[in-house]
Design a protein with these regions (language model features):
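DPxDG-like acidic metal-binding loop motif
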Residues: 59-92
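Surface "functional belts" at beta-alpha junctions
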Residues: 22, 28-34, 88-175
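Short amphipathic alpha-helical face segments that pack within enzyme cores
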Residues: 38-41, 77, 81, 98, ...
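Bulky hydrophobic/aromatic packing residues
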Residues: 27, 42, 50, 72-76, ...
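N-terminal beta-alpha supersecondary unit
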Residues: 1-64
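Glycine-rich nucleotide phosphate-binding loop and flanking beta-alpha elements
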Residues: 12, 68, 119-121
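Residue-level signal for alpha-helix termini/capping positions
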Residues: 48-51, 84, 104-105
Length: 177
């Protein structure tokens, strides 16, 4: 099944196509103020490079945050509109779960993902070394109960990471299995 994935929950706008014969395709642009301007061109580029007709997409996956409202609204609206137009299911996934999955895979350890929330607040969640959530998501001024490496885009992190639409699509496939 061809999956289109979209995440705009952070400063990154990320679009991916998974399941195409051309292989997995990922397009990402980091600019937290231009989600609305870049999501459609990235979507078009990803579909074109994957050599996929939009009518062939069988599922749309969308990162649902937590994150800034404007960015979330752009990604969720784009995913729902695409799904509605193509009459295919749309599934939402916590963007912290997506970031954690990739970080645990790459670092081989438990992680805490920190993401910008409202004003001076941070949203965080902790994950074990299998990327299973063990705490959170919680919004606070400062994270507590930090487990393992800290990754994300807010606060004191060991590594800045944004959710990847390709990791989002792969996580949806894992959860459907």
């Amino acid at each position: 099944m061809l999956i289109l994935a979209i995440d705009t929950s952070t400063a990154a706008t990320s679009v991916a196509v998974l399941g195409a014969t051309a292989g997995p395709i990922l397009r990402t642009q980091i600019d937290g103020r231009r989600h609305a301007e870049v999501v459609a061109p990235l979507l078009r580029e990803a579909l074109r490079e994957a050599d996929v007709d939009p009518a062939d997409i069988g599922l749309v996956a969308c990162g649902v945050g937590p994150g800034p409202f404007t960015g979330l609204r752009v990604g969720i609206a784009t995913a729902i509109a695409f799904g509605f137009a193509r009459d295919v299911p749309v599934v939402g996934v916590c963007s912290l779960d997506v970031t954690a999955r990739a970080a645990v895979r790459d670092l081989g350890t438990s992680v805490t993902v920190l993401s910008r929330a409202r004003k001076s607040e941070v949203c965080w969640a902790s994950y074990d070394d299998r990327a299973m959530r063990i705490a959170g998501p919680i919004i606070r001024r400062e994270p507590v109960n930090i487990t393992g490496a800290c990754v994300g885009d807010a606060g004191p992190v060991d590594e800045v990471r944004y959710p990847s639409a390709l990791d989002l699509a792969e996580l949806v496939v894992e959860r459907m299995a």
